[in-house]
Design a protein with these regions (language model features):
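A short secondary-structure junction signal
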Residues: 145-146, 182-183, 210, 240-241
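Cysteine-centered motifs
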Residues: 4-6
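Low-complexity, intrinsically disordered or signal/transmembrane-proximal segments
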Residues: 9-10, 21, 26, 35
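Conserved nucleotide- and phosphate/pyrophosphate-binding catalytic cores
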Residues: 193, 199-391
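N-terminal Rossmann-like or analogous alpha/beta NTP/dinucleotide-binding catalytic cores
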Residues: 32-175, 293, 332-334, 342
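Structured ligand/cofactor/substrate-binding pocket environments in proteins
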Residues: 51-60, 75-76, 81, 91-95, ...
């Protein structure tokens, strides 16, 4: 899974480029203004595997906070299966198998179907149609300049042969965001170019066809130190293929085994040796998960993480002691997630119904936007009697 798929933001007004010309051509009420008062979030993940603690720290925890903040009128959480197929077209079973796994991880983390609409991307065909119309507003060279696209192409070794669907996924993401009139999108800094491209598409569409689409604002994660957790082997990124992930669905024994095998400072060979906390995965994980109350419960000799770090850097503290503390901290954090997941695993029919109802609600919302888009473009032929007059 990938967090596409994570501050308080307000809806920003769009620049009215070519506004006078637009109003003369399309003398109608702004569809964007009709929806302006609502605060809406869209976010999601690609279902290419079970979600891990990196997803939890990077986006899921923040989503639950936003969901429970009461600041947003609507929250849409998308399982981006169509996007996952852009680089898994020959293995659709991989995507299919992980739809329920991602949904279970969502519910286990505390995402609430009463407060958020959880849906499957491919069950909302309006998104594909919007993508097709937006493609006409973006050049190939502009997509090629997108730093995120460049990085993703390189990561997947697509340089020699890029699937068209994969190449166009920034346009698809713009369709996802605008279809639900998202006013805010939680993203990591590495995804900022995607949001910028979405804003460009919104500006272009509104300048050509009149104010119709809503421009999203960006919500950056508040804990920037934990934007991306390293793998337990010290590699820069958690990866299923590298086997260096701690999954949200891991058992208590699995988590303990992985924590105790974690990479640490390679120069910290003896207890009395000074240790380095910078770039040390154990301390990066503690930065992400540890709270002051954990010390009172599990390590009362220390008041906070700074004290623990100081002792480790000074020498006289073994890695095993730090790892045992980290294991206690993570078990404390993951236990309620594990418990909720067990409940939903025993109620899979309910999970299926949540996805079905969520997808139906999402399609109804996207259909409204598509109707507005087609009206703005004057291609709503059977809803517009002016066609009969040759206008």
């Amino acid at each position: 899974g990938k967090s596409c798929s994570c501050g308080n933001q307000q809806t920003a007004g769009l620049a009215g480029v070519g506004r006078l010309h637009t109003v003369l051509r399309y003398p109608r009420r702004s569809e964007r203004d009709r929806h302006k008062s609502k605060k809406i979030i869209l976010t999601g993940d690609r279902p290419t595997g079970r979600l891990h603690v990196g997803h939890y720290v990077g986006s899921l925890k923040e989503r639950v906070r936003l969901q429970n903040s009461g600041q947003f009128d609507e929250i849409y959480i998308m399982i981006a299966d169509a996007q996952a197929l852009t680089d898994n077209a020959e293995h659709p079973e991989k995507v299919r198998q992980n739809i329920l796994q991602v949904a279970l991880d969502y519910l286990a983390c505390g995402l609430d179907p009463e407060k958020a609409t959880i849906f499957i991307q491919s069950m909302v065909p309006e998104l594909t149609e919007l993508t097709f119309y937006y493609m006409n507003l973006v050049t190939v060279s502009r997509v090629q300049r997108n730093p995120t696209v460049k990085a993703e192409i390189q990561m997947r070794n697509f340089e020699a042969s890029i699937p068209v669907g994969f190449f166009c996924y920034p346009i698809s993401q713009a369709a996802d965001i605008t279809a639900f009139r998202a006013t805010a999108v939680p993203v990591g800094e590495d995804k900022l170019p995607m949001l910028e491209q979405c804003k460009e598409i919104v500006h272009k569409f509104n300048s050509v066809y009149g104010d119709t689409l809503t421009e999203p604002e960006i919500i950056l994660p508040s804990n920037k130190a934990c934007l991306r957790l390293p793998g337990i082997d010290g590699k820069a990124k958690m990866s299923k293929s590298l086997g260096n992930c701690i999954y949200l669905s891991d058992t208590e024994a699995d988590v303990k085994k992985k924590v105790m095998s974690m990479f640490t400072d390679p120069n910290h060979l003896r207890v009395e040796d000074p240790g380095n906390v910078d770039g040390n995965p154990v301390f990066i994980y503690l930065d992400a998960f540890c709270r002051p109350e954990h010390f009172a419960e599990f390590l009362p000799d220390y008041q906070n993480l700074d004290e623990l770090k100081t002792h480790y850097q000074r020498g006289g503290m073994g890695d095993v002691k730090v790892k045992k503390f980290l294991n206690n901290v993570m078990q404390s954090e993951l236990a309620p997630i594990r418990e909720r997941r067990k409940y939903w695993e025993e109620h899979l029919t309910d999970v299926y119904d949540i996805l079905k109802k969520g997808s139906e609600a999402a399609e109804a919302k996207a259909a409204e936007t598509l109707k507005d888009v087609k009206a703005a473009m004057k291609i709503n032929y059977f809803d517009d009697s002016s066609l009969l007059k040759g206008e």
